Amino acid sequence: MEKIELKPASVFHYFAEICKVPRPSKKEEKIIAYLMNFAEEQGLEANKDEAGNILIKKPATPGKENLKTVILQSHIDMVCEKNSDSNHDFLNDPIETYIDGEWLKAKGTTLGADNGIGMATQLAILAAKDIEHGPLECLFTVDEETGLTGAFALKEGFMDGDILINLDSEDEGELFIGCAGGANTIVEFAYEEIDAPQDYFFFQVAVKGLTGGHSGDDISKNRANANKLLNRFLSQLAAKYDFYLCEIDGGNLHNAIPREARALCAVPMKHKEDVRIDMNIYTAEIENEFSVTEPNLRTELGSESPCAKAIDRDTVARLLKSLYAVHHGVYAWSQDMPGLVETSSNLASVKMIDGKIKIVTSQRSSILSSRKDMSEVVRSAFQLGGAEVKTSDGYPGWKPNPASPILKVAIDSYKKLFGVEPKVKAIHAGLECGLFLEKYPHLDMFSTGPTLRGVHSPDERMHIPAVDKFWKHLLDVLVNVPQK
């Protein structure tokens, strides 16, 4: 990395150093050792908790002792993805970087700017002798990428700060002040196997080609849910014919809107052509309903060999009614930030596992009570259908506070420096900030960062000019922090 071309030099110096240290999620020992050694070399107090989270403290510069204590926070792990032709060893090899125009990239791997640039910014501030600031604490958390492990493990009393600035956002000029918490509600229908009538018409029906997407970021975009569309058609068949259901399968990940779903069914042979007509009519209906958001939607219906066994009729009836009734999509919009989803639910997957039909749903909200309410709505729909239902403990959200004092400082600073107002946003997905707020409810927070693109992939890149703007803004915020 040619540091001379990069500004601010100190930030890119430490980013280059961090790139030399392997730091996959759950294998952060080397970067932890680097950070502890850095603190010792700088003569700064450093504490490490049982999870591996590190807190490095730096006293206020002269004349700034009366400012509130600021916690700068990043996570130290990175997503390790590489191209198929790369021989990179993430446990031992440094990340090789190069400059492409205004972008910093890595050779065939993830760059690790998520969240290495946050770390580098913290280290540059901790090492600086010419930056004014009040009392500082720099929090470095472990294993954010695979489960927010460090944030979950953080104990009360580990930090003393009043204000927390998360450095893990990916769009310069945008300030985030809220995120969703979440929980999964897991449903199980027990069923009995019954003999399937062998003289019936057996067929597989499938819904495919849907856009899908993230169950938080994309839940408000009116994209179709393959499980919902499939169940709607199966319900029509069950209402018209002597209907048997042999198999059902849809969706995969709890945090993804399902793109495909299929079922293996049977009806009397005399209704073979009726079912095909029903399918054509239904396909035209849903193509019309989702003409904008689902241009590649398609259905398939094909003959299959007879199944020996089917799901008992009572369970099928209760299953189809429950899947029809359960909420999917936006449940409530934020009253603090127009256009932001506050609460939602995702009907994520329907699987047949170990003699049971297992359904996974995911609820999100920036308000804990609303998330619990959403989970109870889902629970009620399935309990009415006779299923066993369990909801996970989940993780907390971060309710937006547009009146935040540190947000006002950040907005005023940005306008003063760059002549435009930053965008204030919240995200309908999980961030570490929600967990911090649960244990330190007094914290005044916002999240910021330079522009990154292609994160979590070998296409990850960082916009070099954005780093300089992010740096200048952060330093100006630090010197204008409210007094104690």
Predicted segments, located by residue:
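A short beta-alpha structural unit
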Residues: 16-20, 262-264, 298-309, 348, ...
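Active-site metal-coordination/substrate-binding segment of hydrolases
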Residues: 64-146, 151-162, 202, 316, ...
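Zn-dependent metallopeptidase/amidohydrolase metal-coordination segment
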Residues: 7, 11, 335, 342-355, ...
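Acidic, glycine-rich active-site loops and adjacent beta-strand->loop/helix elements
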Residues: 76-78, 139-147, 169-172, 211, ...
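Acidic/His- and Gly-rich active-site-bordering loop/insert found
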Residues: 2-103
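His/Asp/Glu-rich mid-to-C-terminal helical/loop segments that flank catalytic regions of hydrolases
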Residues: 157, 223-240, 270-272, 318-324, ...
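Midchain, well-structured core segments that form catalytic/ion-binding scaffolds
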Residues: 102-105, 145, 152, 156-364
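Active-site-adjacent substrate-binding region
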Residues: 218, 225-227, 232-248, 400-443
